[in-house]
């Protein structure tokens, strides 16, 4: 019997893993689908990466992902690449002497055995989406970019193992190439929102991963997505900012944040200043929202608040990005329950207290957590009476 689920709110999860040498995220997708009598379809996953071209900040790319459905057609998860997972792959390839003179090639430095595992790159996200819409994730590589080439009425050029499309003036539109060796191994498990039975639902995904020998990579994290709607108020938003600034060290200690995780960071001091100023002046939510939006926050912080800064976000969630990498469902939901209790405290209009001076950060966070859980119990008791 699974352990009682400590988590009670609708939550989506992103769990970063790494396939063993010779396996892939596709292998895990097929294993999970088989265990549920379901199916797997290939989809595109969009992300960005630093550009090696001088003067160009980043490329956008589409890479192969695998969406899993059970026998009823219900989505279980999507498995995608995560470009932050690099150290284990680099270390394995270095140990195997990949790339050295005389090396004959091995599973670590051979491309993905799937001949149609490709990625599409562009420096313009709109063009990338158009390329994906006109190509389709299940297109054979020899036909990749045919669709967007027809849109611009130009040919697809082949340069070695690269397919590319340029407009009539020679400006790059998009290019496609095989997935680099090793990039089939990173596996971010992205779940749909889970309303109940979180531990059991996660174990249905992580059990097969453990059986196949999947690992927690060096840079791994687990991200939580919770409904953003309740946090669209001045008191709630202010409390969230105070939680992730004043109690940052304590949160990292209690949750066990991975110091090697990338694409996280402290909320800027300017945000704290704006929130405190607007709160004291009696600002309403639209005014605070506009003031914070002007700061240009990114998602790559300890907590991603960007969805709260618009009333029509593509994904209406608050994203917590500081849980460590884990391969056990109960470990994940146990830490997620801590986050849930603290965020529910943020919904209480009473201002979140500042950490007491001279008290160690972890101890201060535990005191706040105890208060948050006591408030939870007080809310639950009338319903049980």
Please describe what each predicted stretch is.
Residues 1-215, 229-385:
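C-terminal accessory/tail domains of diverse enzymes
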Residues 219:
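Active-site histidine-anchored catalytic micro-motif
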